[in-house]
UniProtKB/Swiss-Prot annotation:
Job of this protein: Involved in T-cell adhesion and p53-dependent induction of apoptosis. Does not bind RNA.
PANTHER family tied to this protein: CYTOPLASMIC FMR1-INTERACTING PROTEIN-RELATED
Localization annotation: Cytoplasm
Protein name as annotated: Cytoplasmic FMR1-interacting protein 2
Gene Ontology CC annotation, any one: neuron projection
Gene that encodes it: cyfip2
Length: 1253
């Protein structure tokens, strides 16, 4: 039966798809996210103690005491948190400045309203510390009673008392440190007294007591000391507590860093409490009751330990403030000022790395079989296999704890020993205390060591977290097997002996242990067990099947078993003879071994919590102690002083490749701190501050990382594209242009879901956004750089674009960027506009700089800047100063490319024209050509036309070519006289030639652009040939057939033939595009299209004024001697610029280049006057005569021979120009006029015949 689903349900189901996790191949370079699952806590705090009625009643009672003491320790922890996280309220409240202030009552009322709940907490704290001291002293008094001094006291009980000692030390130090607490209470007290809130004597007395309690330093310690000293034998119990801490510390009977540091603090504070008026620790040491030398060694190895948050304690201070220190100072080495090797983390790194590699290798072996293959929970393992996994889990936790403790210990030592400007030259004298303790207190090597250790801790946490279910299974199986084997099997022999020897007390303890923990196969103890009767097992043995289950003991059950086992092997007992003496040596050894191993059972049963605690580095962020020291000057410290950001920023600033993959691990310290602030401190404001810092730091992180990645790939592209010969030549001269060192950004670029403060951040997307912006800015900067320079810089623009294109290609392997063409169009402002910034600037440069200021040299085929500019160089905007990576990638690359580019800077030639063709494309070139034609039109129909009209007027009306008999000197003098007005025309060599130069340069630009465009098109055609099935003819041997070889070649390249491929696989639109592209590529060169022909035709249309051709000839054919046509005027101009100049003068070619001749010759050709010019040119006639007579005289200050040489050079140049122009014009004429127009003239008749006729 089909079910109907509504549209709303369907849409909601689709929305739910977004929440499905999609596993990817993202490299794991960050710590594990907080588990969504609940963390089960099976610690009942002995609430189920009454269920174990079979246990020894004394230990059940002791469990009751434990329970109440643990509750008091939890309450003490809450007050420690309250004190540590206390922020001054009174500083934020307006102060009453004088008694006459009108709103003082309102201020005082608000002060009381705000501070009363806080003062109530302080009052409760004072009562609590009294109650805690009283409770502790009562326990000490009870245990030190004369009748109970020889009673057995369990290690767990002694450790609980040790935790009390630690709590007193911590609370007292916190109370001493917090001046803001005293200030807030004073402000409240002042306001309350004014408002008469405390009228009754009891309230006044309590307030006074609180004031004294807060004001007196070490008040808790003093009260505790005073009350302990009146208890007889208290030092014996404290000695037991200190000794158990020494033993635990020495044998590494701790797991978490906090447990390790607690043992040391209890040793130190315990010694301080023991050393007083009543007892002397040095006498106790002499009696071997305690071992001061061992404690001294511990304190020398670890001089500073964390006290609470960022508060640290120097352990030697407990010794130095003890009563009998001065006379026994020589016995202590820990009080001497020396740095322990423990704090040199760089030297420790060799061992840490070795431990890490060994453990990771072993863990990977299990991980591959358990997690990757999925056989972890399904397969049943042997006890040995479970034991191996159990040991592996324990060793992993111990390693993590060791590394975390090491980091915290070095950090603590640095906080206690801040640097200064003498120790660190980078540290300014005005640096704050916290800044000197964090920002300037670590060398680069120490920061890297910190990062590496943190990465090891967090990385191993990930691996062990993945195997949590496997470890938990193995832990429960192993603990169950160990307990059951020990209780059901190992304890049979001592029970048999105890029954046989009738040791009732021992029997009761052993039976209590078995009844407390045993899980019998049949549900009850076998009644026929011979050991219960003290008998030997039968010869075949008594078969006891111990079951196997994955069930661990409860916390109370484990406590009862361990305590009862401990009572069997303890040196103390309530009776004269200890129970230990009733047991055999091997049994005692077995019990001791089991008791030692079972110490870690509690931690391992709570594996998830233990793993989190062993990896907790949250205290690296908290700074309440140092904030308190600023006395309100700082609300919070900047990120530059925050350890997580210091470490992260150090990696980013140094760009160390080996550390780059660790960059996310320091940021996880914020996760630790935020978790601690919410779950342990339970302070929202601390979390808010962490979150605010994370927001700022992560923005900075993405900003810096994105810039680094872009700079790296830009430098890589610049290095790849740098000319190899140039690099080799630099190397020969000792200049090394390095490649950027390989870095590991790829792993970071694959991060799609970075976990930070519960957020899943797509780092790849954020980096993509910034790099897209950087790429756009880089392209914009390249174009802006081109816009700020002349036309020669277009070569540099292409290089910059090529480097950016390669950068884009490299980055696109990891990031989803827009296409390069789209980015370039956007930067070029060419998205919707028909032409972009490049095209506009090319035309702008052509119009305002290139045409008026460049001279063309036909020999080199280059334009160079004129020696004498006739126009001012245009003003260009300077490009903005940017980082080197926005140009070529780095400073060395910028210098290298600048040197290469300098060879293209002083001319405009074929490289520049090819670049213009590639960058502007057909559309851009068409725009530029159109605008150039407008300039040429305005010149030919404006300035040039006016000058032509003026010069035609000053030309001689008739100027015949003199006969050869006059000789070249005479002819020169004749022409000089005839053209005197032209020669002396002031504006001829300036404005007239300048205008013609601009026309000539424009024509030349069009010609050279077409030549460059043709080369580019040929290149495109050759590249496209294999994809268009255009194959070269192959070489064939004798006897071979060409058709067969060609068919074989066509078959080989058939997969590359694009059009059939698209026709078979593409859409109709794609097929149409492919066909059109194929047709365009094939036909654009085959058609023989010529742009320059069109240009010349358009220019010819601008020469419509009659002045260009002159009036109709009187003879009806042509003007011979009359100077009315343009070619005669150009002959006169040519005569002028052929006259040699003086020594320090510039020639016409230096000032105007060949562009001047191109303009004149082009106009002559377009007017159809080339042959007349060749026949009637004044200079050519002079050259012809001079070549015949070979004379060399100076006529009118003009050296004849030099002038003839110049004429010859220009004649050659003119012929070349005419040849080029005629090549294009003849094709035009042949196309336009297929019929040749012939005009017939009557033959000439002699005058004598004419008269006769």
């Amino acid at each position: 039966m089909t079910t109907h689903v509504t549209l709303e349900d369907a849409l909601s189901n689709v929305d739910l798809l977004e929440e499905l996790p999609l596993p990817d191949q993202q490299p794991c370079i960050e710590p594990p996210p907080s588990s969504i699952m609940y963390q089960a806590n099976f610690d009942t705090n002995f609430e189920d103690r009454n269920a174990f009625v079979t246990g020894i009643a004394r230990y059940i009672e002791q469990a009751t005491v434990h329970s109440s003491m643990n509750e008091m320790l939890e309450e003490g922890q809450e007050y420690a948190v309250m004190l540590y996280t206390w922020r001054s309220c009174s500083r934020a409240i307006p102060q009453v400045k004088c008694n006459e202030q009108p709103n003082r009552v309102e201020i005082y009322e608000k002060t009381v309203e705000v501070l009363e709940p806080e003062v109530t907490k302080l009052m409760k704290f004072m009562y609590f510390q009294r109650k805690a001291i009283e409770r502790f002293c009562n326990e000490v008094k009870r245990l030190c009673h004369t009748e109970r001094r020889k009673d057995f006291v369990s290690e767990a009980y002694l450790l609980t008392l040790g935790k009390f000692i630690n709590m007193f030390a911590v609370l007292d130090e916190l109370k001493n440190m917090k001046c803001s607490v005293k200030n807030d209470h004073s402000a409240y007290k002042r306001a309350a007294q004014f408002l008469r809130k405390m009228a009754d004597p009891q309230s006044i007395q309590e307030s006074q007591n609180l004031s004294m309690f807060l004001a007196n330093h070490n008040r808790i310690t003093q009260c505790l000391h005073q009350q302990l000293e009146v208890i007889p034998g208290y030092e014996e119990l404290l000695a037991d507590i200190v000794n158990i801490c020494v033993d635990y510390y020495e044998n590494k009977m701790y797991l978490t860093p906090s447990e390790k540091h607690m043992l040391l603090k209890v040793m130190g504070f315990g010694l301080y409490l023991m050393d007083g008026n009543v007892s002397n620790i040095y006498k106790l040491d002499a009696k071997k009751r305690i071992n001061l030398s061992k404690i001294d060694k511990f304190f020398k190895q670890l001089q500073v330990v964390p006290l609470f948050g960022d508060m640290q304690i120097e352990l030697a201070r407990y010794i130095e403030t003890s009563a009998h220190y001065e006379e026994n100072k020589s016995k202590w080495t820990c009080t001497q000022s020396s740095i322990s090797p423990q704090y040199n983390i760089c030297e420790q790194m060799v061992q840490i790395r070795d431990d890490h590699i060994r453990f990771i290798s072993e863990l990977a072996r299990y991980s591959n079989s358990e997690v990757v293959t999925g056989s972890g929970l399904d397969s049943q393992k042997s006890d040995e296999e479970y034991r191996e996994l159990f040991d592996l889990a324990l060793r992993g936790l111990q390693l993590l704890s060791k590394w975390s403790a090491h980091v915290m210990e070095v950090y603590s030592w640095k906080l206690v020993h801040p640097t200064d400007k003498f120790c660190n030259k980078d540290c300014p004298g005005t640096a704050e205390e916290y800044e000197r303790a964090t920002r300037y207190n670590y060398t680069s090597e120490e920061k890297f060591a910190f990062v590496e250790v943190i990465a090891m801790v967090k990385g191993l946490q990930v691996l062990m977290g993945r195997m949590e279910s496997v470890f938990n299974q193995a832990i429960r199986n192993t603990i169950y097997a160990a307990l059951q084997d020990f209780a059901q099997s190992s304890l049979r022999e001592p029970l048999r002996q105890a029954v046989r020897k009738k040791k009732n007390v021992l029997i009761s303890v052993l039976q209590a242990i078995r009844k407390t923990v045993c899980d019998w196969e049949a549900g009850r103890e076998p009644p026929n067990d011979p050991c219960l009767r003290g008998e030997k097992d039968p010869k075949g043995g008594f078969d006891i099947n111990v079951p196997r289950r994955a069930v661990g003991p409860s916390s109370t059950q484990l406590y009862m078993v361990r305590t009862m086992l401990e009572s069997l092997i303890a040196d103390k007992s309530g009776s004269k003879k200890t129970l230990r003496s009733s047991l055999d040596g091997p049994i005692v050894q077995a019990i001791e071994e089991f008791h030692k191993q079972s110490f870690f059972f509690t931690h391992l049963l709570n594996f998830s919590e233990a793993l989190q605690q062993c990896c907790d580095l949250s205290q690296l962020w908290f700074r309440e102690f140092f904030l308190e020291l600023t006395m309100g000057r700082r609300i919070q410290f900047p990120i530059e002083m925050s350890m997580p950001w210091i470490l992260t920023d150090h990696i980013l600033e140094t760009k160390e490749p080996s550390m780059m993959e660790y960059v996310l691990y320091p940021l996880d310290l914020y996760n630790d701190s935020a978790y601690y602030a919410l779950t342990k401190f339970k302070k929202q404001f601390l979390y808010d501050e962490i979150e605010a810092e994370v927001n700022l730091c992560f923005d900075q992180f993405v900003y810096k990382l994105s810039d680094q990645i872009f700079a790296y790939y830009k430098a890589m592209s610049g290095s790849v594209l740098l000319d190899k010969r140039f690099r080799a030549e630099c190397k020969n001269y000792g200049v090394i242009i390095p490649y950027p060192p390989s870095n590991r950004y790829e792993t970071l670029l694959k991060q799609r879901h970075v976990q930070l403060l519960g957020r899943s951040i797509d780092l790849n997307r954020l980096i993509t956004q910034r790099i897209s912006a950087a790429m756009y800015k880089s392209l914009d900067q390249a174009i802006s750089r081109f816009e700020s320079e002349d036309l020669t810089s277009i070569v540099e623009l292409e290089w910059l674009l090529d480097i950016n294109r390669l950068t884009h290609r490299l980055l696109s392997k990891h990031l989803t960027l827009d296409s390069f063409d789209a980015m370039f169009r956007e930067a070029n402002h060419n998205v919707s506009a028909p032409y972009g910034r490049n095209t506009l600037h090319v035309f702008w440069e052509l119009n305002f700089d290139f045409l008026p200021n460049y001279c063309y040299n036909g020999s080199t085929n280059r334009f160079v800047r004129t020696a004498i500019p006739f126009t001012q160089e245009p003003q260009r905007d300077k490009p903005a100063n940017v980082q080197p990576y926005y140009l070529y990638g780095s400073k060395p690359l910028n210098i290298a490319y600048s040197h290469i580019y300098s060879s293209y800077r002083n001319f405009v030639g074929p490289p520049h024209f090819k670049t213009i063709c590639r960058l502007l494309g057909y559309q851009g070139i068409a725009v530029v050509m159109e605008e150039l034609l407008k300039i040429v039109k305005s010149l030919l129909q404006g300035t040039v036309l006016q000058y032509v009209k003026t010069l035609i007027e000053v030309m001689p009306k008739i100027c015949r070519l003199p006969r050869h008999e006059y000789g070249s000197p005479g002819i020169l003098e004749f022409f000089h006289h005839q053209l005197k007005d032209i020669i002396e025309y002031a504006e001829l060599k300036t404005d007239v030639f300048q205008s013609l130069r601009e026309v000539g340069n424009a024509i030349l630009f069009c010609l050279l652009i077409e030549q460059a465009l043709s080369q580019e098109e040929v290149c495109d055609l050759l590249h496209a040939a294999p994809f268009q099935n255009i194959l070269p003819r192959v070489y064939i041997k004798e006897g071979e057939r060409l058709e067969v070889r060609m068919k074989r070649l066509e078959a080989k390249y058939a997969p590359l033939h694009l059009v059939p491929l698209i026709e078979r696989l593409g859409t109709p639109q794609q097929i149409a595009i492919a066909r059109e592209g194929d047709l365009l590529t094939k036909e654009r060169l085959c058609c023989g299209l010529s742009m320059f022909e069109v240009i010349l035709t358009r220019i010819r249309s601008y020469l419509q004024d009659p002045i260009w051709r002159g009036p109709p000839p009187t003879n009806g054919v042509m003007h011979v001697d009359e100077c009315v046509e343009l070619h005669r005027l150009w002959s006169a101009m040519q005569f002028v610029y052929c006259i040699p100049v003086g020594t320090n003068e510039f020639t016409a070619e230096q000032c105007f280049g060949d562009g001047l001749n191109w303009a004149g010759c082009a106009i002559i050709v377009l007017l159809g006057q080339q042959r007349r010019f060749d026949l009637f040119d004044f200079c050519y006639h002079l050259l012809k005569v001079q070549r015949q007579d070979g004379k060399d005289e100076i006529i009118k200050n003009v050296p004849l021979k030099k002038m003839a040489d110049r004429i010859r050079k220009y004649q050659i140049l003119n012929n070349e120009i005419f040849a080029v122009l005629n090549k294009y014009m003849k094709s035009v004429e042949s196309d336009s006029s297929t019929v040749e127009h012939v005009r017939c003239f009557q033959p000439p008749i002699h005058q004598s015949l004419a008269t006769t006729c």
